Amino acid sequence: MEFQKGPSDQRTFVSAILNMLSLGLSTASLLSSEWFVGAQKVPKPLCGQSLAAKCFDMPMSLDGGITNASAQEVVQYTWEAGDDRFSFLTFRSGMWLSCEETVEEPGEKCRRFIELTPPAQREVLWLSLGAQTAYIGLQFISFLLLLTDLLLTSNPGCGLKLSAFAAVSLVLSGLLGMVAHMLYLQVFQATANLGPEDWRPHSWNYGWAFYTAWVSFTCCMVSAVTTFNTYTRMVLEFKCRHGTSFNTNPSCRAQHHRCFLPPLTCAVHAGEPSTSCHQHPSHPIRSVSESIDLYSAAALQDKKFQQENSQELKEATESSVEEQC
């Protein structure tokens, strides 16, 4: 009766792929300046400057008289009114930088987003950045744990522990990521309302980095659920195949107990197939940690049973010798 780890390996592989995808998307969104995009309402330059508004010339005399006087100057007027007097320039903003188009010359002008944030919101922004960094760090740790579990395919004991730690790390990282995204959204809304007047957006919307961050969060939580499912299945299968054997048949010898649990092969009862599994209702349900260390307890129980059998065999031998004498 061997401990089969094939289906668990497949689920672990799926968890690792989802975790790697989430890690890449979250890193890209953190470094991007496309969380929010929109337009800024900027007055057009005066007549005579570069990229000026549409103007026309009207001659006027210097003394305010008739226009055919000898001394004249040219006054520029524009017919543009309302929103036509303004330019709507695109901008984009991220956790680190905010870039907007310039009127005077083609190109963008970038500023640090923390310089635009109101002083009351800067601590919240730093908290959001810290949570986002911890989110990525925990995802990286989870990926290393899942990768180690995949490489140790013949050691289900450590695989259980690695799956448990990876699942907990993924859940924590997902919660931190959700908090980081919501905090940054709050900071941006406050900056859009209370930030510098030359930066306040006329209209804004979510950019691709915002959606990428939430897709990353979704992949992280799906990976966590898959890892927990893998761990639960391995624990239940392990208890079903091995727990009853150790309690009902002490002749099942456990090999040397280490972190890596060896496969167990033994007969359960005479006349029953080796693959049979019985669930005794009198056996209490063990916790997760007890299930992981089941081999250790079984090995101690088996050792104690061997000592008792050896003592009984010795006494029986002595009594038979005395009877013969």
Swiss-Prot record:
Biased composition (Basic and acidic residues): 306-317
Main location: endoplasmic reticulum
Compartment list: Endoplasmic reticulum membrane
Alphabetical UniProt keywords: Endoplasmic reticulum, Membrane, Transmembrane, Transmembrane helix
Annotated region described as Disordered, given as residue ranges: 306-325
Transmembrane segments: 12-32, 127-147, 165-185, 208-228
Topology relative to the membrane: Multi-pass membrane protein
InterPro entries (alphabetical): GSG-1, PMP-22/EMP/MP20-like
Pfam families xrefs: GSG-1
Transmembrane helix as UniProt keyword: yes
GO cellular component, as recorded: endoplasmic reticulum; endoplasmic reticulum membrane; plasma membrane
Family membership noted in the UniProt record: Belongs to the GSG1 family.
Subunit relationships: Interacts with PAPOLB.
Task performed by this protein: May cause the redistribution of PAPOLB from the cytosol to the endoplasmic reticulum.
Protein name: Germ cell-specific gene 1 protein
Provenance organism: Rattus norvegicus (Rat)
Gene for this chain: Gsg1
